[in-house]
Amino acid sequence: MAPDLSELAAAAAARGAYLAGVGVAVLLAASFLPVAESSCVRDNSLVRDISQMPQSSYGIEGLSHITVAGALNHGMKEVEVWLQTISPGQRTPIHRHSCEEVFTVLKGKGTLLMGSSSLKYPGQPQEIPFFQNTTFSIPVNDPHQVWNSDEHEDLQVLVIISRPPAKIFLYDDWSMPHTAAVLKFPFVWDEDCFEAAKDEL
């Protein structure tokens, strides 16, 4: 005997209503779940208190980084400004980037290590000392590292880069070929804001 189509239709309608109800219940319950907050602080104020800005090492030993004026945090288009403090004896990673970079030394002294961009790898770096109230520029794509060579005092620098956010290539050592350098983009201090900006599209 063939099933009664009206009974099948009624059963399907009941099942559909049940599933729709379950779906609404799940959506309603999900709306009460905590939402993961981004630690990205966006601030387009004309005047900002640096002491109130987020500061972190971002997993880089001996570094304290503040994005004073940035592309992702503050809407900057052409330049980005960082305030960085490097502990005695510590170094930034060996890296290069396709943007201009200018350092102004506010406190302390250190050594700039500069590798070659014209060879297959950075090679033995040139060591260039610097001290408080000096400034130095990094040529585009030249591998470099900033070292607080002082054993007692922090090194504090104001850093300005062009074309933010920076695309940074990291090296394990000075003999690593340029083609093996690893792109880190977004860089560690841009990750939260980069994800938030991407999510807003």
UniProtKB/Swiss-Prot annotation:
Keywords: Auxin signaling pathway, Disulfide bond, Endoplasmic reticulum, Glycoprotein, Metal-binding, Receptor, Signal, Zinc. Glycosylated. GO terms for biological process: auxin-activated signaling pathway; cytokinesis by cell plate formation; positive regulation of cell division; positive regulation of cell size; positive regulation of DNA endoreduplication; unidimensional cell growth. Zn(2+) binds at H95, H97, E101, H144. A motif (Prevents secretion from ER) lies at residues 198-201. The keyword NADP does not apply. It is found in: Endoplasmic reticulum lumen. InterPro entries: Auxin-bd, RmlC-like_jellyroll, RmlC_Cupin_sf. Residues 1-38 form the signal peptide. Expressed in roots, coleoptiles, leaves, stems, tassels and ears. The keyword Nucleotidyltransferase does not apply. Homodimer. Receptor for the plant hormone auxin. This is Auxin-binding protein 1.
